């Protein structure tokens, strides 16, 4: 049978301005309305608001719209305190007051746990911090604009690869913020600006760290300018050249003091961005676990020992397990640095069966997990076999927490406590802590 060419149907987007009423926020912080019974997502809109929107995307099951005007504002709406907020992709909830942000995140956490884990529970008090000056590390993008012959230093625009030039970031730790104007001036005079990659700034307790990603070796003139800048500002300087190799140039090795333990780290290592929330989080985790001096504790996804070392001060022995070998070595160094002798660290792929591993032969009544966004799939199924009676799960992704909760519930655990950790104020990013206790 002959086939005749049929042109694809092109649906035209109705771009006229349309009024809608926002019903609630979705889990990413966008306003949710309904247009012709179809879900419509509007960034920057708040529940209860009547707004004017223009469609930007219209799919079969949902649509997206640009906020044109707020016709009837919410009582929770506030003026953003950052001059870059309208363009920058870093924060997405500065238009919502602080109490509203916390309420939204708690509600989102509760809804996800009910939907995917079937668990409804009154939340513990949220763990919060100051909402400005809290970020002790940040990565800033660099791009040389050939047309304007100017360097762009800042953060990515919302839903774009373009860069918003930033000379002041209110959520950045003040001593890091102070570096931005002079750092921009320094790099704007770079001999080969097209080779600039990105900049990382980290605030340790003993030093500020500057990491420059550069494509290829630096010419002598640029190297001298950079080291002079680091010396004048008393910075620890690292270069990241080909293949992600980290090269220490000058300055003392950084460390941070966390709940009575000193954690040495490299800029390539993970440390929590919000120091205040991290410290409260560690204290809460230890309180929820209720560790006694006769118990062995297992810390999974242990990193540099953020939880492991404080746990070791309460337990008979602690085992920390981490997937990255370099982190294991550094965690071992941190234990020695703090003169803690009842802890051992191991490298392992925690997606695999660990029940036959040497460290798993002696059981653990108390277990703490702090996985990455992918969650603890694999090891979470083995917690009963490892002897766990009480489990604290620290999560940076409520969706994978809800998924992994199903495994724990099927093993005979019950959800005892649940709380929100506001690690990133003014963003929709949600972290949480859950306590599971074995029935009987």
UniProtKB/Swiss-Prot annotation:
Ligand binding (S-adenosyl-L-methionine): 272, 301, 306, 322, 349, 370
Which residues are involved in binding [4Fe-4S] cluster? Answer: 82, 88, 91, 169
Annotated GO biological process = rRNA base methylation
The molecular function GO annotations come to:
4 iron, 4 sulfur cluster binding; iron ion binding; RNA binding; rRNA (uridine-C5-)-methyltransferase activity
Residue intervals of the TRAM domain: 11-69
**Which parts of the chain are coiled coil?**
none
Active site: residue positions:
396
What are the UniProt keywords, alphabetically? 4Fe-4S, Iron, Iron-sulfur, Metal-binding, Methyltransferase, rRNA processing, S-adenosyl-L-methionine, Transferase
Q: What is this protein called?
A: 23S rRNA (uracil(1939)-C(5))-methyltransferase RlmD
The EC designation for this entry is 2.1.1.190
Q: Which InterPro entries match?
A: 23S_rRNA_MeTrfase_RlmD, MeTrfase_TrmA_AS, MeTrfase_TrmA_CS, NA-bd_OB-fold, SAM-dependent_MTases_sf, TRAM_dom, U5_MeTrfase_fam
| Annotated catalysed reactions | uridine(1939) in 23S rRNA + S-adenosyl-L-methionine = 5-methyluridine(1939) in 23S rRNA + S-adenosyl-L-homocysteine + H(+)
Per the record, the similarity remark reads: Belongs to the class I-like SAM-binding methyltransferase superfamily. RNA M5U methyltransferase family. RlmD subfamily.
Note the NCBIfam families from the entry.
Answer: PRK13168.1, rumA
* Functional description taken from the UniProt entry: Catalyzes the formation of 5-methyl-uridine at position 1939 (m5U1939) in 23S rRNA.
């Amino acid at each position: 049978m002959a086939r005749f060419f049929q042109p694809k149907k092109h649906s035209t987007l109705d771009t006229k301005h349309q009024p809608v009423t926002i019903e609630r926020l979705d889990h990413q912080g966008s306003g949710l309305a309904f247009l012709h019974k179809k879900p419509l997502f509007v960034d920057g809109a708040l529940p209860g608001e009547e707004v004017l929107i223009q469609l930007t995307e219209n799919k079969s099951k949902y649509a997206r719209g640009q906020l044109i005007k707020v016709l009837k504002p919410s009582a929770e709406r506030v003026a953003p305190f950052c001059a870059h907020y309208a363009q920058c992709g870093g924060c997405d909830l500065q238009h919502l007051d602080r109490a509203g942000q916390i309420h939204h995140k708690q509600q989102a956490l509760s809804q996800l746990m009910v939907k995917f884990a079937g668990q409804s529970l009154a939340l513990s008090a949220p763990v919060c911090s100051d909402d400005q000056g809290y970020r002790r590390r940040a990565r800033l993008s660099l791009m040389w604009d050939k047309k304007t012959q100017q360097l762009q230093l800042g953060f990515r625009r919302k839903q774009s690869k373009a860069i918003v030039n930033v000379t002041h970031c209110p959520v950045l730790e003040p001593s890091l913020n102070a570096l931005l104007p002079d750092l921009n001036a320094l790099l704007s005079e770079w001999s080969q600006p097209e080779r600039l990659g990105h900049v990382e700034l980290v605030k340790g307790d003993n030093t500020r760290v500057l990491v420059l990603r550069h494509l290829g070796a630096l010419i002598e003139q640029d190297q001298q300018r950079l080291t002079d800048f680091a010396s004048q500002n008393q910075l620890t300087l690292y270069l990241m050249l080909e293949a992600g190799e980290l090269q220490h140039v000058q300055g003392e090795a950084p460390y941070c003091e966390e709940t009575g333990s000193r954690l040495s780290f490299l800029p390539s290592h993970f440390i929590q961005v919000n120091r205040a929330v991290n410290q409260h989080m560690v204290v809460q985790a230890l309180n929820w676990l209720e560790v006694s001096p006769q118990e062995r504790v297992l810390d999974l996804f242990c990193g540099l020992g953020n939880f492991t070392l404080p746990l070791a001060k309460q337990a008979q022995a602690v085992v920390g397990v981490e997937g990255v070998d370099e982190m294991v070595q550094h965690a071992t160094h941190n234990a020695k640095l703090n003169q803690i002798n009842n802890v051992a660290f191991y490298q392992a792929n925690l997606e695999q069966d660990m029940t036959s591993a040497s460290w798993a032969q002696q059981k653990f009544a108390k277990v703490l997990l702090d996985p990455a966004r992918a969650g603890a799939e694999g090891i979470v199924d083995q917690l009963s076999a490892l002897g766990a009676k009480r489990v604290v799960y620290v999560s940076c992704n409520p969706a994978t927490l809800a998924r992994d909760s199903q495994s724990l519930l099927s093993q005979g655990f019950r959800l005892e406590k649940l709380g929100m950790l506001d690690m990133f104020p003014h963003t929709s990013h949600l972290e949480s802590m859950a306590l599971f206790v074995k029935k009987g």
